[in-house]
Amino acid sequence: MAYFISFEGIEGCGKTTQLKLAAQYLRTLKIPVGTTEEPGGTPLGKKIRNILLNRGPFEICAEAETLLFVAARAQHVREVILPSLARGQWILCDRFSDATAVYQGCVRGIDEAWIRQLDSFATSFLKPNLTLLFDLPAETGLHRAMQRMTGIPENSREDRFEQEGLNFHEKIREGYLALARQESERFRIINAAADIPSIHREVCRHLDVLRQQPEAGLP
């Protein structure tokens, strides 16, 4: 049985590091696993990622931003995620639909019902079997994100969201926690302020629970 798992959280929460460690863990168990990210994961998605995350000479309105994220996701689902699951390969995805619901819905103010409808069309109603939410104070995450950018040439930085103020990131955190309360069966909240090995052990516990479940289809 192949499972689809998304890794979510504010900037600097460490989800990307934990995704890589989780993939390594599953491979030690001889479980076929692929890793991917949003926006990205496909040639089209990478071009859209470059537009969305790199600072440029133009502004992107919230509506255009939303449509670009969802367009990248539509291609990603059909080109990468669904074919991989059909082959029996687990997929670990760095952000998925919840990120759009939070960043563009809760924070940018785009109508959340419209986002859900648009996203359902783009994904053919696909949802992760499990979503790991890496939670920590927004100030801590933003500090980590800024440290991560140190030494990276300015024209190579994917930092458009990191450049937002603390209030923006606090709203992102609140939005994620609200989603986790609404869909508590799918979400698992992980204390991302802990050290990397401790967080990894908790991630592995959740993966072990998932792989011991009786076979079932995707939500």
Curated annotation (Swiss-Prot):
Alphabetical list of InterPro entries matching this protein: P-loop_NTPase, Thymidylate_kin-like_dom, Thymidylate_kinase
GO biological process per UniProt: dTDP biosynthetic process; dTTP biosynthetic process; dUDP biosynthetic process
Primary enzyme class: transferase
Keyword presence, Kinase: yes
Keywords linked to the UniProt accession: ATP-binding, Kinase, Nucleotide biosynthesis, Nucleotide-binding, Transferase
Catalysed reaction equations from the record: dTMP + ATP = dTDP + ADP
Pfam families: Thymidylate_kin (PF02223)
Entry function: Phosphorylation of dTMP to form dTDP in both de novo and salvage pathways of dTTP synthesis.
Family to which the UniProt record says this protein belongs: Belongs to the thymidylate kinase family.
NCBIfam families tied to this protein: DTMP_kinase
Protein name: Thymidylate kinase
Organism from which the protein derives: Syntrophus aciditrophicus (strain SB)
Lineage of source species: Bacteria, Pseudomonadati, Thermodesulfobacteriota, Syntrophia, Syntrophales
This protein's encoding gene: tmk
